[in-house]
From Swiss-Prot:
It comes from Herminiimonas arsenicoxydans. Transmembrane segments: none annotated. Belongs to the TACO1 family. InterPro entries: Integrase-like_N, TACO1_YebC-like_2nd/3rd_dom, TACO1_YebC_N, Transcrip_reg_TACO1-like, Transcrip_reg_TACO1-like_dom3, YebC-like. One of its GO terms (cellular component) is cytosol. This is Probable transcriptional regulatory protein HEAR0561. Gene3D superfamilies: 1.10.10.200, 3.30.70.980. The keyword Cytoplasm applies. It comes from the Bacteria.
Amino acid sequence: MAGHSKWANIQHRKGRQDEKRGKIWTRLIKEITVAARMGGGDIAANPRLRLAVDKAADANMPKDNVTRAIQRGSGGLEGVNYEEIRYEGYGINGAAILVDCMTDNRVRTVAEVRHAFSKFGGNMGTEGSVAFLFKHCGQFFFAPGTDEDKLMEAALEAGAEDVTTDEEGGIEVICPPHDFSAVKDALAAAGFKAELAEVVMKPATETVFEGDDAVKMQKLLDALENLDDVQEVFTNAVIEQA
């Protein structure tokens, strides 16, 4: 199934993640700690923890950091208790935004998120105001030139729901979140390595931003992503790169 081009945006997203590697480590330590607290420190028995540890490996985080985070979460070491909160809001031209946070101070976090929205042309919404526009799923992206037929066969056999190819040849695979690890392992066993592999909130529809609106929207997203308590930002905005 064909779709519009996402490949440039994926490459841009990867580059931005590389630029923020130090912050990514901090976020992953929080995620590993909370995952271990919620589901235990056994990676084999805790899918959320396994996903976080896999992300840490992809981000070249030292194993000692990962081990300490698991120990803090499972009670082996003292540490901060983080609360998970999701905020919803609107960006430029009403674009939908979800902001996932982990915090030890809810009052501080909501104030910082609200300030970022208002400073850069957005506004906070109420619970449920935009969440219905997104679907929780596993998402994989493969580079142009990947064998689409073989990838599709392996993905669908492993439990993927959808495989789409954009106009540049980049391939997106979508699966239920609980099947993410199984699909990832099956694709790796078949010889496929994803450029990006994440569990995300995927928008049902997208809005393309160009020119000045794209610049304004990117500033808002950057402001939210740069907040210390923010783990993930999801939006239905597609920023066209100049």
